[in-house]
Amino acid sequence: MAIRKKSTKSPPVLSHEFVLQNHADIVSCVAMVFLLGLMFEITAKASIIFVTLQYNVTLPATEEQATESVSLYYYGIKDLATVFFYMLVAIIIHAVIQEYMLDKINRRMHFSKTKHSKFNESGQLSAFYLFACVWGTFILISENYISDPTILWRAYPHNLMTFQMKFFYISQLAYWLHAFPELYFQKTKKEDIPRQLVYIGLYLFHIAGAYLLNLNHLGLVLLVLHYFVEFLFHISRLFYFSNEKYQKGFSLWAVLFVLGRLLTLILSVLTVGFGLARAENQKLDFSTGNFNVLAVRIAVLASICVTQAFMMWKFINFQLRRWREHSAFQAPAVKKKPTVTKGRSSKKGTENGVNGTLTSNVADSPRNKKEKSS
């Protein structure tokens, strides 16, 4: 009874456990401060920097387009404030998914601690990957990326973005930045933190690089491709936790993972190595956002190639570990067959002894006693 009373007792205010249990409510209050600031004229100018997208430019309508004017956006230092606000939103959404979806499933399935943490990770990431993949695909279709692939490098620099494009990148940066405090909120194990930091850092590095170097068209295509493959992996792992015999999803993911790496390299080399290399304007100009110079192109291709090689190395190690576990699981089943035959033969030998030696009962049987007396 004493243990139950301790568990129901609320922790002290602003203590370590209090922050962990109520971090979503605390973050919600901080986000509400920015939203309430929009209601007052004094604070509206400061709050609007956090809530809405900045640096918009209105372009007049052309003859080819509609009669209405078009609003486009470019990036700037104020985007950091917007990323911070939507990082708070990502923390709130993370807590809602955890409490109202994943925790309920965990109570029904009764997972172990190891499976519990992996299930939560795959549940959160599969929801994010699905949403981002659908959103990114919608942008690709609406802006004719699929019908005209040359848009990846044509008219570079792509310093002006549509509302959907810029909001997509702001949301991506906000989500992966929110993953850092989630390591603390979710009580991540110390041995898992380095792995988490590596892939969070890789996401932020490549997304921010595509955003700042005005390679947002190429970055969007590669993100949608990568997110689709990762969504398939995490949704397969969710099905695997519910039924350990489920392996079809992993087999399909393994094929698509390799194809995804090849497509990433092909699109990157085609866009950066050939498309931008043949462009007329190849001068470094920070005012217009033109980074189409040889050094930048080599750095971009090198970072992409190194990342793809690192992912393939992790993938090969993952597959080897799975094959070892599968072979180790089948090995005891093969070894059990000869033990059954030995057991049958040992039953026949129990009349004379155990393991080739006479027992005391056999040695002292009446027949042996008669032979001894004679």
UniProtKB/Swiss-Prot annotation:
The chain crosses the membrane at residues 30-50, 77-97, 122-142, 160-180, 193-213, 218-238, 252-272, 298-318. It holds the Pfam family TRAM_LAG1_CLN8. One of its GO terms (molecular function) is signaling receptor activity. Glycans are attached at N56. Residues 51-76, 143-159, 214-217, 273-297 are lumenal. Belongs to the TRAM family. This is Translocating chain-associated membrane protein 1. It comes from Homo sapiens (Human).
